Amino acid sequence: MTIYEKALEVQPFVQDCRRTIHRWPELGMEEFRTTDFICEKLDEMGIPYRRLEPTGCIAEIKGNQSGKIVALRADIDALQMNEINDLPFRSERPGYMHGCGHDTHTAMLLGAAKVLNTMREEINGTVRLIFQPSEENGLGSQVVADQGGMEGVSACFGEHVFGGTGEKVGVVHYKKGGLFPSADTFWIHVHGIGCHGAMPDMGVDATVCAAAIVMNLQSIASREISPLEPVVVTVGSLHSGTAYNICSGEAEMTGTVRTFSKEHRKTFPDRLRRIVENTARAYRCTAEVEYGCGSSALINDPYVTEIARKAAEKILPDSSLLVEGGGSMGAEDFSLYTEYVPCTFFTIGCGEETFNHNEHFVVDESIFPSGVALHVQFAIDYLNDQATNT
């Protein structure tokens, strides 16, 4: 029986796991019921694990032959949004939804665990299963790393479902090199002097200053960085003023900066402060900038990606489903693992119409066997490669 056939065999199990998790979505660091469910399934399979604090868990399947450790990762948290669809297993928690597919990631990794548990004689080493909490706020991978999740690991693999791409369901994307950029956050506070809207000369309008700052920040990407290098500077929120006839004395903004370049990333705090402070001065205001570093860029290791690509070729039912490319300017905290070991991260098309983070988001469950089989085939192939070449 092929690995894909084994994945088809556990499809009812994976589907049931996914639907159970989907009904009870939990936010990052609050996935207590989800963690309990994962541990319950691991207990049923006889797979040892340890719980993370406060949520998540790490399990291990040891092969009959000794060797290196390869990690497979799934995120388990949900989003704070209402689900709007007619699924019989839709969210039972108003205001919470698995709108990014993490329920499917968790279920597919459980399915992979079920398959791998029957293949110990073919595992030349150990497969570590990481059920990671709190991806959405970028904190979960650090929790895993801080609690020893990367200790002894030689390589790590992850996968993510994506909808709304317009491509055929089940298309698997791989890419060597940069897949997702670093994602940092900034906060800007502008101080002016409030006054009556009919007498703007009597004050210092923080709203006008804030608007100028928003526009001037775009020159970082358009005039300070090569057009051949993708950079995004976005002001996502701007709050200023309390009434239609008052010139505001205060304005606050938040935003994000994204890049694949470590060198550029180091310069962004100073670039922002220079533009913000000088623009504020030009408008007779003052301003402060706070800058916070988030996820680093996710750069797929070429060697590990090639092993995963060949694994995908073996398991996909249709060769046209494997496509080179993909990626976006979105962020993914899987990137932290790349700072510890060589990693690769693949994406799977799960629906043509609805995007992730949408209240109508739906995953086509026919992709589950591919996701399960890709985990399994990669783990076995990587460990075999290491056993042969080291």
Show which residues each predicted segment covers:
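Metal-dependent amide/peptide-bond hydrolase catalytic core
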Residues: 44, 211-390
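Hydrophobic face of alpha-helices
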Residues: 11-14, 35-39, 109, 207, ...
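Histidine/acidic-residue-rich, glycine-tolerant segments that coordinate divalent metal ions
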Residues: 79-81, 85-97, 104, 109, ...
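Acidic/His- and Gly-rich active-site-bordering loop/insert found
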Residues: 1-98, 103, 107-123
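Conserved hydrophobic/aromatic beta-strand scaffold that supports enzyme active sites
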Residues: 56-60, 187, 345
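Non-cysteine beta-strand/loop elements that form the S-adenosyl-L-methionine
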Residues: 73, 82, 186, 343-350
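Divalent metal-coordination and catalytic microenvironments
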Residues: 21, 59, 72, 102, ...
